[in-house]
From Swiss-Prot:
EC main group: transferase
Database matches in Pfam families: Sua5_yciO_yrdC
EC code(s) of this entry: 2.7.7.87
Biological source species: Citrobacter koseri (strain ATCC BAA-895 / CDC 4225-83 / SGSC4696)
Protein known as: Threonylcarbamoyl-AMP synthase
Length: 190
């Protein structure tokens, strides 16, 4: 699988993100749709596209832990908890962290926490590095339809002109596992 994204494709995707628009891209298991987490306009576009209520909260996907630190509060983690998290990252495990009051409600929804993941998908790593921050990430599918696993499925659901970063998913059958960062409680099996 070759997920090395050409520089021009990265630049094109970053340009779309800077316009506060939503893009689709392959992740570990399915295609995701994402946008700039700091843009309420972009997040509202994503929520409208997905017909997803803001109260549900969202997931951020990043190239590294440093990109996530402005959005989460990791001060209560013990060394053991930190080791358990970093043993899973980068990889397809999402952790729910407490969120500081500065994290926008359009990301956290009705929660005082935020779900985050450091991806090991090389294309998404390249995209987040080029953009300089994490992306909001949720499965690429319209309400009631299965998540897209190919570029063709994304275009069939979202339209031929929807901005898609072409590439292959990581081949996982299930979406990421979701766990509480402080307790390790499993919220969703991966």
């Amino acid at each position: 699988m070759n997920n090395n994204l050409p520089t021009d494709a990265i630049a094109a995707a970053v340009a779309v993100l800077h316009k506060e628009c939503v893009i689709a891209y392959p992740t570990e298991a399915v295609f995701g749709v994402g946008c700039d987490p700091d843009s309420e306009t972009a997040v509202n576009r994503l929520l409208e596209l997905k017909q997803r209520p803001v109260e549900k909260g969202l997931i951020l996907i990043a190239a590294n832990f440093e990109q996530l630190k402005p959005y989460i509060d990791d001060s209560m983690l013990t060394d053991t908890q930190r080791e358990a998290i970093f043993a899973c990252w980068p990889g397809p495990v999402t952790f729910v962290f407490p969120a500081p009051a500065t994290t926008p409600r359009w990301l956290t929804g009705r929660f005082d926490s935020l779900a985050v993941r450091v991806t090991d998908h090389p294309l998404v790593v390249s995209l987040c590095q080029a953009y300089g921050k994490p992306l909001v990430s949720t499965s690429a599918n319209l309400t009631g339809l299965p998540p897209c696993r190919t570029v063709e499925e994304v275009r069939a659901q979202f339209g031929a002109d929807f901005p898609v970063v072409e590439g292959e998913t990581g081949g996982r059958l299930n979406p990421s596992e979701i766990r509480d960062a402080l307790t390790g409680e499993l919220f969703r099996q991966g």
